[in-house]
């Protein structure tokens, strides 16, 4: 008996030279795989942060979990009400609807592979974030697209206390 194997999407290979890179060293975001390339299964980016630099402010995703794999350095991560420090080789998974944020730990840079699942078409979100960083877009523009990119900004006292000490 033979089975028919029909893939949901074509296998994806993203070559370094073909990767869209946002930001400027040492603070960059490499756009690796958006939801449209994986039939909505996942989205993948790689973020590099300079010593003690902030990454994402406190936010949550209604429909997706987010995984952080620290490739190098040390990363502070808000996961709910707790701030943990993850080191190279550590993995942290944040469930949907859980407030989270991340930054390079004080005195350290961080290189992080981030996977969100199910995937959300978010490359345009990161491009907007880059335009805000360069002063080419208003930070309020991010508030206007929270629903579209399932990135909902909130406050976090534990995160503010932790980062104020940096």
What positions do the PLM features span?
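A short, N-terminal "cap"/entry segment at the start of jelly-roll beta-barrel domains
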Residues: 1-43, 135-166
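Glycine- and acidic-residue-biased ligand/ion/polar-headgroup-sensing regions
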Residues: 63-75, 80
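Short acidic-glycine-tyrosine-enriched beta hairpin
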Residues: 15, 81-99
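Hydrophobic small-molecule pocket/channel-lining residues, especially in calycin-type beta-barrels
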Residues: 61, 75, 124, 132, ...
